């Protein structure tokens, strides 16, 4: 995903470079009749460890208070109150370009970006996760705009080399949100642990998803640097590439000013 306006310098540059490399390496397969299908995922094999430093909390007291206010509004699913926490004009919504409709209000653009108004849609849950996210980082290109979650600390060159060596895309990678998570032999949470992951990148395999029993927690099927495969609790994992929500502070306090990512258009 390109982010023409808001870009976190070194890691985002590495992600763009690796994404371009992955597209060039993988291509697509031609099907009879002229159709295309994605290539098979790269094989699982051991890979070089790349250390990760999780993003630090943005502990500005006024921002912490704003997040609490946002969490309260989201818990009530109060759209009118939410509108007061979003800029009325000049809201931006980037995927490969700015998708915001400048004729509409900020809340209407935010709602479209996260499917807020869809019955049973993910919008309110998405906002709840952002309200709970303590990190945020100022954009080098737009001072005074802070986007969350902030990028983790990673050696950009090592990450590009990792992606090229494994033939993977940036979206295939994640890291533990806390140091030391168990990798289990099977999806059920009582399965034996086969390895413990520290603060390093690990590969998320494409068959990750909800277990057959909806009462069981969401797990991710992963490949560790040692070349083993197993399952980790999705709640203990942060994806390397994810949507971001952006904030800015004016005389009236903090406001939501933009969104990076969102529902496919």
Give the residues covered by each predicted segment.
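SH3/SH3-like beta-barrel superfamily modules
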Residues: 194-237
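Short, low-complexity N-terminal intrinsically disordered segments enriched in polar/charged residues
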Residues: 29-72, 84
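Short, well-ordered alpha-helical segments enriched in acidic and aromatic residues
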Residues: 78-89
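N-terminal signal peptide c-region/cleavage motif recognized by signal peptidases
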Residues: 17-21
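Boundary regions of SH3-family modules and the immediately adjacent low-complexity/disordered segments
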Residues: 117-175, 221-265
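Short, charge-rich amphipathic alpha-helical segments embedded
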Residues: 90-107
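Bacterial N-terminal signal peptides that target proteins for export
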Residues: 1-10
């Amino acid at each position: 995903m390109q982010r023409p306006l808001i870009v976190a310098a070194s890691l985002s540059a590495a992600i763009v470079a690796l994404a371009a490399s992955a597209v060039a390496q993988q291509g697509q397969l031609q099907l009879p009749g002229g159709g295309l299908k994605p290539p098979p995922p790269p094989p699982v094999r051991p890979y070089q460890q790349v250390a990760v430093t999780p993003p630090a909390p943005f502990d500005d007291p006024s921002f912490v208070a704003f997040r609490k206010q946002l969490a309260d509004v989201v818990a009530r699913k109060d759209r009118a109150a939410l509108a007061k926490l979003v800029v009325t004009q000049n809201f931006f919504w980037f995927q490969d370009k700015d998708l915001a409709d400048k004729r509409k209000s900020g809340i209407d653009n935010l709602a479209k970006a996260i499917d807020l108004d869809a019955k049973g849609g993910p919008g309110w849950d998405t906002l709840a996760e952002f309200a709970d996210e303590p990190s945020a980082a100022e954009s080098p290109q737009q001072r005074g705009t802070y986007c969350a979650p902030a990028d983790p600390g990673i050696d950009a060159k090592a990450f590009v080399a990792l992606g090229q060596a494994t033939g993977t895309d940036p979206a295939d990678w994640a890291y533990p949100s806390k140091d030391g998570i168990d990798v289990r032999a099977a999806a059920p949470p009582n399965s034996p642990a086969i390895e413990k992951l520290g603060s390093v990148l690990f590969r998320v395999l494409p068959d990750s998803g909800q277990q057959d029993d909806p009462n069981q927690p969401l797990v991710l099927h992963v490949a560790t640097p040692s070349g083993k495969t197993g399952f980790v609790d999705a709640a203990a994992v942060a994806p390397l590439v994810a949507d971001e929500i952006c904030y800015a502070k004016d005389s009236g306090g903090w406001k939501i000013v933009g969104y990076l990512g969102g529902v496919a258009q």
